[in-house]
C-alpha cells in the first residue's frame, strides 16, 4: 500500500522526482513478472485529511500522473514490509492443483490426482481411512463451501466483507510485522517456478538444490490465488486439544467457537494445519492504539450487533457466518417453508464478483454446492491429513492455447 513494485532484484528505498514534485524514502518491493526497468505505484494513498485510519499512510502518486520525465534515485536504507505470506512458490507441493484447458477437455479429472495409501483393506484414498467415530452428517443440514481457483482473481472482496461482517479488528502494520494478523480469511498467492521435480530428475540435481531453486519464482511467472479460511474439518485437529471445550463440532458440520470458555492456550492454533485461527493479543476494541472507529460511542455503531466482539486472550476464526444461517432458519420457520438452495450465504460468497465461492447445504442433493462437491475437479486442501474439511477447492484450469 505504500511502496513501488519493481523488477530489480533488491529491496531498497528510493527517491522519486519529476523536477517539481518529490517523494522521499519510498520503499521498493520486488515482484516477479514486473517488466524490466519499470515500476508500479498504487494511487489513493498519501492522504492528509482521511482521518486517523487513513492519514499519512503511503505516498501520493497523483502528482506524477501527467509527467513525462521522471527520475528514480536509489538511496541507502532498508524497509521492513508488513507481509503475511513469506513463501511465494509451492515448491513442488500440490497445494493448488491445476491443469490446462486442453487436458481438462480430454479428462475432467486432469490435474486432480488422488494419492492412495496402503491399509489392511488394500490401497485406499485418505478419506476412506479413519480412527475417528464418525459424525452423523446425513441428518439435517451439512454446510459446505466450494472455492473455484479458476474464477478467483485475488481481488480481496471476500476478505473485506468478512472483516466488516464479523467485527474483525484492523491491527495495522506494526502488529502484522509480528505475525499478529486478525483476518479470518486470507488469500495466498503463488508464483510458478522454472524448477520442477521432473526437470531435477532429468538434470540429476540433488534434492537440496532442487528445493532451493524451487523457492525462486520464474522471471515471467504464472500466478494463482487461493482463499483460505477455517476449513470446518469433520476430523478437526483443533477440537482434540482444547482443554476447556471452547471449540466443538456442531451437528451441521461446523467447527464452533464458544468465546467465553476460551482461556487462550492457543493449542488449537498450533494444531491447525491450515493456520487460520487468530489470537487477540489486545483488547482491540478498547485500546487507543487500535482506535479505528471502535472506541467511541458513535464509532461502535458500525459494529454488527449479531456478532460478539471478542476479548483479549481469546482465539477467533471463521464461523461460516453462523449468524446469517440462524437468521435464515428463523425466516424460513416464520414463512412455513424449507430452506432453499442459495438462501444461506456467507458474506465471502455473496460478495464475490466472479462467483468463485459457492456456499450451501451438501445434504440438499439438488444444491449447487452438492453438485460441485461431486465434480471431478473437487479436492480437499492437504487431503493426505484426512481432516475432512467442509471447505473444498476446484482444480484451476489454465487456457494456454
List where the protein language model places each region.
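Short beta-strand-centered aromatic/proline hotspots
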Residues: 25-30
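Helix N-cap / beta->alpha transition motif
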Residues: 7, 41-42, 100, 148
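Short gly/pro/ser/thr-enriched loop/turn and capping motifs at secondary-structure boundaries
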Residues: 23-24, 35-36, 48-49, 286-288
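Non-ligating segments of multi-cofactor redox enzymes
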Residues: 54, 61-401
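Short, solvent-exposed secondary-structure boundary/capping segments
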Residues: 33-45
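Phosphate-backbone binding interfaces of nucleic-acid-interacting proteins
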Residues: 40, 47-56
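Single conserved hydrophobic/aromatic residue that forms the stacking wall/gate
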Residues: 1-6, 11
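Short conserved beta-strand and strand-loop elements enriched in small hydrophobics
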Residues: 12-22
Amino acid at each position: 500500500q505504500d511502496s513501488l513494485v519493481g523488477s530489480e532484484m533488491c529491496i531498497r528505498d528510493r527517491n522519486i522526482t519529476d523536477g517539481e514534485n518529490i517523494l522521499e524514502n519510498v520503499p521498493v518491493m520486488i515482484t516477479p513478472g514486473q517488466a524490466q526497468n519499470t515500476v508500479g505505484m498504487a494511487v489513493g494513498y498519501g492522504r492528509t485529511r482521511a482521518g486517523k485510519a487513513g492519514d499519512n499512510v503511503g505516498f501520493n502518486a497523483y502528482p506524477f500522473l501527467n509527467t513525462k520525465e521522471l527520475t528514480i534515485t536509489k538511496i541507502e536504507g532498508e524497509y521492513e514490509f508488513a507481509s503475511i505470506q513469506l513463501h511465494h512458490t509451492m515448491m513442488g507441493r500440490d497445494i493448488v492443483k491445476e491443469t490446462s484447458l486442453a487436458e481438462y477437455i480430454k479428462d475432467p479429472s486432469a490435474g486432480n490426482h488422488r494419492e492412495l495409501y496402503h491399509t489392511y483393506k488394500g490401497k485406499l484414498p485418505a478419506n476412506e481411512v479413519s480412527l475417528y467415530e464418525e459424525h452423523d452428517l446425513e441428518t439435517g443440514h451439512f454446510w459446505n463451501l466450494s472455492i473455484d481457483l479458476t474464477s478467483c482473481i485475488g481481488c480481496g472482496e471476500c476478505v473485506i466483507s468478512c472483516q466488516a461482517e464479523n467485527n474483525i479488528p484492523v491491527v495495522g502494520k506494526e502488529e502484522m510485522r509480528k505475525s499478529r494478523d486478525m483476518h479470518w480469511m486470507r488469500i495466498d498467492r503463488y508464483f510458478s517456478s522454472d524448477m520442477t521435480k521432473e526437470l531435477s530428475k532429468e538434470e540429476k540435481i540433488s534434492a537440496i538444490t532442487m528445493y532451493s531453486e524451487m523457492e525462486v519464482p520464474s522471471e515471467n511467472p504464472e500466478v494463482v490465488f487461493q482463499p483460505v479460511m477455517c476449513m470446518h474439518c469433520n476430523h478437526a485437529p483443533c477440537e482434540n486439544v482444547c482443554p476447556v471445550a471452547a471449540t466443538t463440532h456442531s451437528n451441521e458440520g461446523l467447527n464452533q467457537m464458544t468465546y467465553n470458555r476460551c482461556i487462550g492456550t492457543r493449542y488449537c492454533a498450533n494444531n491447525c494445519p491450515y493456520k487460520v485461527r487468530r489470537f487477540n493479543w489486545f483488547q482491540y476494541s478498547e485500546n487507543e492504539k487500535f482506535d479505528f472507529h471502535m472506541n467511541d460511542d458513535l464509532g461502535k455503531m458500525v459494529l454488527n450487533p449479531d456478532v460478539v466482539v471478542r476479548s483479549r486472550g481469546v482465539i477467533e476464526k471463521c464461523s461460516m457466518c453462523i449468524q446469517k444461517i440462524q437468521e435464515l432458519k428463523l425466516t424460513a420457520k416464520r414463512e412455513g417453508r424449507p430452506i432453499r438452495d442459495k438462501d444461506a450465504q456467507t458474506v465471502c460468497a455473496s460478495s464475490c464478483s466472479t462467483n468463485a465461492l459457492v456456499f450451501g447445504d451438501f445434504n440438499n442433493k439438488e444444491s449447487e454446492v452438492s453438485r460441485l462437491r461431486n465434480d471431478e475437479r473437487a479436492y480437499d486442501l492437504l487431503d493426505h491429513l484426512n481432516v475432512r474439511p467442509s471447505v473444498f477447492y476446484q482444480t484451476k484450469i489454465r487456457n494456454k492455447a
